[in-house]
Swiss-Prot record:
Disulfide bonds join 509-1318, 536-993. The gene is XDH. Binds 2 [2Fe-2S] clusters. Binds 1 Mo-molybdopterin (Mo-MPT) cofactor per subunit. The lineage of its organism: Eukaryota, Metazoa, Chordata, Craniata, Vertebrata. It comes from Homo sapiens. Subject to partial proteolysis; this alters the enzyme from the dehydrogenase form (D) to the oxidase form (O). This is Xanthine dehydrogenase/oxidase.
């Protein structure tokens, strides 16, 4: 049968595709076929929003053009017939003009690495196309499907607030917490209230937007016909009528129906499932209809969830409240269901038929008694969605030929009450741990139960109803006895085995009770409002807040920084909030990342083949099936390596595993083929047989088996025995700190291009470490380093994850290019990246602290254990830094810290922002908080009492000079109004039984330098051209931290020329050799001094010409020097002086200086669910004399939010066999827009120049991250209040809270009558779903 032509529009241009393949996504088509690289691949599963585009079509049922955002990574091109696609390139560019959305995110400093920026731009653009004057709430909701790992979200929201009709300036009324008039303080120096000037923004003019393609508009009344698209393996049929659809289903009962592809697309990509026949019913009117009937509202099964949501919102606004109880429950679930990109395309019917056991909506539909209409050729039936509808895992009552035609969501009746609940790891766009729909119907005029439905997701392999429990409650009164009986019944009926998939067994069981208790209280409250209190009892006022749905105030933020001195030249940009130099290009999609480089004509694609066993011998590798895949070129392995297969920082790694694998994800080989799709299929065809060996997975396993790398590391000072003997109190404890995935938005990527002579090869790499990439590739190929050129334009984030681990990809790709003689490209998929490349080290610490009754610490002993993985990588240096930071900011006269590196069968863990420091400091604050509790003293008082003073020696004997921490502490106490708010928190906790607040203030001291002395060096190369323009190169790489921008500012001041004359193109090994990695927060310090040195050389050469022509211009002096045959090219070099520490003698300076900061955070926890919200954070940070306040504040906020993820949200789950469960944004949750503090206030400490760094600045990348521990300990403070109330224990009780403080840990720590009903016994031989590594 002949395939049809696919016709759609992209940015106004008509596209006619004669060979549309149903397996091709819009993202792949845009990037590879149309060359539109602005739309990015971040995850491939619709979870990050980097691929967001706007789709527009004429909706025949609504009779209007509709615009909606969508994830291009999931949208099959075959679904786009007669659709207009708008990408970031289509709304504006630097060559023409930026769209106001692009301009505002750039100028408000909302783009750092820039990889997420195009997707965020398109989410905002789509919102404005539908709502030119949105509310701030609508703006925040528009980004529920977008993630950013760099900025901390604040500048994005602040920039886009200028579009809001309820945002921006308050007109001087002072009624806005962000009022600019409130920000100007009476200081001796001028503080700036704004990082950008909104009045300079281009106004939004909706009339100037591109029009919908007239050709598509003319087709709106043309009858649709069935379409057929044939791919390599899959056929796609677009049915145009219901009859066609039913006939197709009868002919092909196994065909999959696809509307949004948000489920099937995931199964095809990540579960390797193949569906040869796909039928799309999206055009069929009956499946898209919305009908208001006498019993409820019916939605066609293909209705997008966004239509369901809008319809129900309208109904709730118009109908009596009593009639819309169910609607409000559905809306509460849809509120957190997913991002706009998913809700705009995912269908309500697809959500039901997918039959997910953790569905957000199915428990609600089941509890409401929703009716489903099922049809097949010749039959039609209506069934109620009850406990029989899902007979098993991912199964429904539908026969193979049947389809779901519609769902009727019922109106609620008089005396009927309904609630819906969901608890996930993250509030926004997250898969539920437990969901529930609950309904009760009372006999008229009474509180006697006539019907009760309690339905749950996440408590079995399907959506279930607690029938035994509910049947027992019929005819009972809505009173305490019923509550107790239901809770006892649920605990018994919904019991989970200890090895249940998904884990968190006690938490999930407790949630079933907590949800019912909330429902019970909500109904009690409503009955009271209806004057039925006498029949059911009165709601305790302290319980009332437990019934409140989550609400968040509009974001409020303050940024304070010291303005440049009066008289500073307008051209001197040092100290000014200059936007990131690439921000405009990033916002328009023009910035080029590694995978954006146009494909070479003869380019090949590579896919890694990795181990599925944690520890095993390789018995055989069979590539016969891989070779059958079209486009297959070769398989490479250790046997193909021409040089050395030994690699890694410590020479304990291999490029490819040869005889044995030592972790799941260990690279065994790679498949090379003509396209990424073919390489993926071929890689799946490689069959490996293993002989399994015993594996060590956890820190406890390593300790038990004495599995360590190297000897014990130790720092010791004072007389520990004497210190403990003199202490009034001694407390011992243990804390575990989980690992963290880097989750840079751009995964690892390398393009290797063989040059065809003398072994030369050019590599384009997303790496922080050009030198190691060069040397590792050269060693593997057996050629000198001078034959390998490594080039880095920019990275889409790094955070330490691309310091060493990028080489595991680069070496494999280089070998493939060497073997084939052709360019080879590899960009890891998100799941591969997370599986292979490691992350932050998990730590286990055992501590013992001695202290006086006054709170003064006199002795400390801490044993640190880190889970290193299967190779050492940078782990020793990371442990060393943890030991250097085990004091945080506190003077401890007698101290001993030890560190052991646990050798395990996990992928090697590596550098991550903070580099061991955050782990060491969290442990310190853990025992410090316990000192305060034991002494019965305010925590802030104990912390202040133990702080170092100017001139003190640390435990590693480095003298503290320029110790600004006390100033940061006092400023933060004052600006946060700590003491007044502490009283308010205490008052709130007395008045609220089931919600508690906590407040905490935390300091940080972070050492600046590589602790390996020889790395503290940098080079720069500066070319001045005869037109006066300057090309600058330095050894640092740009990953969003603004390093290139700062270096241009440094050069601009040094040369006394505008920044517009200076350009940085890239970082490469053939311009600046032997570079240190861009890491340790020192890149601006090191490279800034090298740039300065190069500038001084040029200035010295130009000096004679300036003297000859003092009134001349820069160009005049440059031309004169050139004519006089003077070199206009110079190198610069810098090394940090006086560094070098000895562990043997505990002497020498490991650091050049320290950065300091203090944060105060307030949180509110829901004791029943473990949910929490971050109410407010105040930060005071010492960054010296800021080179660029906008970039520095962005680093403070971004680091803080990344720390917020580390300490409260991000959790890696490994199976007992060492396989990572959490391999993408659907299972691993980084902070989202809604995760940040509602009030976020950042102040840079004024008048604190740092004489040890370029232009008196300070490092800023890593130091602020630990300040997020203020949220962790505020949560612990709130839990303490809950435990004191519900257990009757003394507030001096010590309890353990490991990091991260997830909802599970918070809820389980809030011990109460519900948790005691849900304690699961774990049999000795039970193998849990996940283990703590």
């Amino acid at each position: 049968m002949t395939a049809d032509k696919l016709v759609f529009f992209v940015n106004g241009r008509k596209v006619v595709e004669k060979n549309a393949d149903p397996e091709t996504t819009l993202l792949a088509y845009l990037r590879r076929k149309l060359g539109l690289s602005g739309t990015k691949l971040g995850c491939g599963e619709g979870g990050c929003g980097a691929c967001t585009v706007m789709l527009s079509k004429y909706d025949r049922l609504q009779n209007k053009i509709v615009h909606f955002s969508a994830n291009a990574c999931l949208a099959p091109i075959c679904s786009l017939h007669h659709v207009a696609v708008t990408t970031v390139e289509g709304i504006g560019s630097t060559k023409t003009r930026l769209h106001p959305v692009q301009e505002r995110i750039a100028k408000s400093h909302g783009s750092q690495c820039g990889f997420c920026t195009p997707g965020i731009v398109m989410s905002m653009y789509t919102l404005l196309r539908n709502q030119p004057e949105p509310t701030m709430e609508e703006i925040e909701n528009a980004f529920q499907g977008n993630l950013c790992r760099c900025t901390g979200y604040r500048p994005i929201l602040q920039g886009f607030r200028t579009f809001a009709r309820d945002g921006g300036c308050c007109g001087g009324d002072g009624n806005n917490p962000n009022c600019c008039m409130n920000q100007k303080k009476d200081h001796s120096v001028s503080l700036s209230p704004s990082l950008f000037k909104p009045e300079e923004f281009t106004p939004l003019d909706p009339t100037q937007e591109p029009i919908f393609p007239p050709e598509l508009l003319r087709l709106k009344d043309t009858p649709r016909k069935q379409l057929r698209f044939e791919g390599e393996r899959v056929t796609w049929i677009q049915a145009s009528t219901l009859k066609e659809l039913l006939d197709l289903k009868a002919q092909h009962p196994d065909a999959k129906l696809v509307v949004g592809n948000t489920e099937i697309g995931i199964e095809m990509k990540f579960k390797n499932m193949l569906f040869p026949m796909i039928v799309c019913p999206a055009w069929i009117p009956e499946l898209n209809s919305v009908e208001h009937g006498p019993d409820g509202i019916s939605f066609g099964a293909a209705c997008p969830l966004s239509i369901v949501e809008k319809t129900l919102v309208d109904a709730v606004a118009k109908l009596p409240a009593q009639k819309t109880e169910v609607f409000r429950g559905v809306l509460e679930q849809l509120r957190w269901f997913a991002g706009k990109q998913v809700k705009s395309v995912a269908s309500v019917g697809g959500n039901i038929i997918t039959a997910s056991p953790i569905s957000d909506l199915n428990p609600v539909f089941m509890a409401s008694g929703a009716k489903l209409t099922l049809v097949s050729r010749g039959t039609r039936r209506t069934v109620q969605m009850d406990h029989t509808f899902f007979p098993g895992y991912r199964k429904t009552l539908l026969s193979p030929e049947e389809i779901l035609l519609s769902i009727e969501i019922p109106y609620s009746r008089e005396g009927e009450y309904f609630s819906a609940f969901k608890q996930a790891s993250r509030r926004e766009d997250d898969i539920a741990k437990v969901t529930s729909g609950m309904r009760v119907l009372f006999k008229p005029g009474t509180t006697e139960v006539q019907e009760l439905a309690l339905c749950y997701g996440g408590m079995a392999n399907r959506t279930i109803s607690a029938l035994k429990t509910t049947q027992r409650q019929l005819s009972k009164l809505w009173k305490e006895e019923l509550l107790q009986d239901v809770c006892a019944g649920l605990a018994e009926e919904l019991h989970l085995p200890p090895d249940a998939p998904g884990g968190m067994v006690d938490f999930r069981c407790t949630l079933t009770l907590s949800f019912f208790f909330k429902f019970y209280l909500t109904v009690l409250q409503k009955l009271g409002q209806e004057n039925l209190e006498d029949k059911c009892g009165k709601l305790d006022p302290t319980f009332a807040s437990a019934t409140l749905l989550f609400q968040k105030d509009p974001p409020a933020d303050v940024q304070l920084f010291q303005e440049v001195p009066k008289g500073q030249s307008e051209e001197d940009m040092v100290g000014r909030p200059l936007p990131h130099l690439a921000a405009d290009m990033q916002a328009s999609g023009e910035a080029v990342y590694c995978d954006d480089i146009p494909r070479y004509e003869n380019e090949l694609s590579l896919r890694l083949v990795t181990s599925t066993r944690a520890h095993a011998k390789i018995k055989s590798i069979d590539t016969s099936e891989a070779k059958k895949v079209p486009g297959f070129v070769c398989f490479i392995s250790a046997d193909d390596v021409p040089g050395s297969n030994i690699t890694g920082i410590c020479n304990d790694e291999t490029v490819f595993a040869k005889d044995k694998v030592t972790c799941v994800g260990h690279i065994i080989g790679a498949v090379v083929a003509d396209t990424p799709e073919h390489t993926q299929r071929a890689a799946q065809g490689v069959k490996i047989t293993y002989e399994e060996l015993p594996a060590i997975i956890t820190i406890e396993d390593a300790i038990k088996n004495n599995s360590f790398y190297g000897p014990e590391l130790k720092i010791e000072k004072g007389d520990l025995k004497k210190g403990f003997s003199e202490a009034d109190n001694v407390v011992s404890g243990e804390i575990y700190i989980g690992g963290q995935e880097h989750f840079y938005l751009e995964t690892h990527c390398t393009i290797a291009v063989p040059k065809g002579e003398a072994g030369e090869m050019e590599l384009f790499v997303s790496t922080q470490n050009t030198m190691k990439t060069q040397s590792f590739v050269a060693k593997m190929l057996g050629v000198p380093a001078n034959r390998i050129v490594v080039r880095v334009k920019r990275m889409g984030g790094g955070f330490g994850g691309k310091e060493t681990r990028s080489t595991v990809v680069s070496t494999a790709v280089a070998l493939a290019a060497y073997k084939t003689g052709r360019p080879v490209r590899c960009m890891l998929d998100r799941d591969e990246d997370m599986l292979i490349t490691g992350g932050r080290h998990p730590f286990l610490a055992r501590y013992k602290v001695g202290f006086m009754k006054t709170g003064t610490v006199v002795a400390l002993e801490v044993d640190h254990f880190s889970n290193v993985g299967n190779t050492q990588d940078l782990s020793q240096s990371i442990m060393e830094r943890a030991l250097f930071h085990m004091d945080n900011c506190y003077k401890i006269p007698n101290i001993r810290g030890t560190g052991r590196l646990c050798k395990t069968n996990l992928p090697s863990n590596t550098a991550f922002r903070g580099f061991g420091g955050p782990q060491g400091m969290l442990i310190a604050e853990c025992w410090m908080s316990e000192v305060a509790v034991t002494c019965g003293m305010p925590a802030e008082e104990v912390r202040r009492k133990n702080l170092y003073k100017e001139g003190d020696l640390t435990h590693f004997n480095q003298k503290l000079e320029g110790f600004t921490l006390p100033r940061c502490w006092e400023e933060c106490l004052a600006s946060s109004q700590y003491h007044a708010r502490k009283s308010e928190v205490d008052k709130f906790n007395k008045e609220n039984c089931w919600k508690k607040r906590g407040l905490c203030i935390i300091p940080t001291k972070f050492g600046i330098s590589f602790t390996v002395p020889f790395l503290n060096q940098a080079g720069a190369l500066l070319h001045v051209y005869t037109d006066g323009s300057v090309l600058l190169t330095h050894g640092g790489t740009e990953m969003g931290q603004g390093l290139h921008t700062k270096m241009v500012q440094v050069a601009s001041r040094a040369l006394k020329i505008p920044t517009s004359k200076i350009y940085i193109s890239e970082t490469s090994t053939n311009t600046v050799p032997n570079t240190s990695p861009t890491a340790a927060s020192v890149s601006a310090d090191l490279n800034g001094q090298a740039v300065y040195a190069a500038c001084q050389t040029i200035l010295k050469r130009l000096e004679p010409y300036k003297k000859k022509n003092p009134s001349g211009s820069w160009e005049d002096w440059v031309t004169a020097a050139y004519m006089d045959t003077v070199s206009l090219s110079a190198t610069g070099f810098y090394r940090t002086p006086n560094l070098g520490y000895s562990f043997e003698t505990n002497s020498g300076n490991p650091f050049h200086y320290f950065s300091y900061g203090v944060a105060c955070s307030e949180v509110e926890i829901d004791c029943l669910t473990g949910d929490h919200k971050n109410l407010r954070t105040d930060i005071v940070m010492d960054v010296g004399s800021s080179l660029n306040p906008a970039i520095d504040i962005g680093q403070v906020e971004g680091a803080f939010v990344q720390g917020l993820g580390l300490f409260t949200l991000e959790e890696l789950h490994y199976s007992p066999e060492g396989s990572l469960h959490t391999r993408g944004p659907s299972t691993y949750k980084i902070p989202a827009f809604g995760s940040i503090p509602i009030e976020f206030r950042v102040s840079l400490l004024r008048d604190c120049p740092n004489k040890k760094a370029i232009y008196a600045s300070k490092a800023v990348g890593e130091p602020p991250l630990f300040l997020a521990a203020s949220i962790f300990f505020a949560i612990k403070d709130a839990i303490r209040a809950a435990r004191a109330q519900h257990t009757g224990n003394n507030v001096k009780e010590l309890f353990r809270l490991d990091s991260p403080a997830t909802p599970e840990k918070i809820r389980n720590a809030c011990v109460d009558k519900f948790t005691t009903l849900c304690v699961t016994g774990v049999p000795e031989n039970c193998k849990p779903w996940s283990v703590r590594v």
